[in-house]
Amino acid sequence: MLELLYATGMRVSEMLHLQIFDVNLQFGYVVCNENGKERIIPIGIPCKKAMERYLQTARTVFVKDEKETALFTNCSGKAMSRQGFWKVLKGYADDAGIKRDIAPHTLRHSFAVHMLQNGADIRSVQEMLGHSDISTTQVYPVSYTHLRAHETSA
């Protein structure tokens, strides 16, 4: 889940609404349907491999009802809730020794900043994030510029 969030910049709600048929590992993309809008988000090899492992191992352990199409499920094999995801995230943070509060949106923010750092154009990032207004996406270059200024002054 964390790999998918970071690799795509999806919102947690978008990820939790994914169905198995929304993921195409052969061609490396995820179809995100949120608020009546559909967007196709590419995923790279690390994310594809993580998704393959999840689908072949963890999901098959939890899901007993073959009619269940939710991509991410809880231990009972039902679609995972936001609260359930929050517990998973908190557990990973604790395991990693992270003491500060961690928010799922941090992964979305990191995705956008890292895409821009590595040469993606802002319009492409806007489309992948699903922002209808470019001004929402323009916050990320400001964050990136602020980070670079902080790095060079240190």
Please describe what each predicted stretch is:
Residues E3, A7, G91, R108-S132, ...:
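C-terminal catalytic core of tyrosine-transesterase DNA break-rejoin enzymes
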Residues G9-R11:
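Extended, charge-enriched helical/coil interaction regions that scaffold DNA-processing
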Residues S13, H17-R53, K67:
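Conserved tyrosine-mediated DNA breakage-rejoining catalytic core shared by Y-recombinases
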Residues G28-N33, A103, H114, Q126-Y144:
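Short functional hotspots where side chains directly engage DNA or cofactors
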Residues I40, A79-Q83, D101-A103:
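N-terminal core-binding DNA-recognition domain of tyrosine site-specific recombinases/integrases
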Residues K48-K87:
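Major-groove DNA-contacting interfaces characterized by cationic-aromatic clusters
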Residues T145-T152:
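Conserved small/polar residues in nucleotide/adenosyl-binding loops
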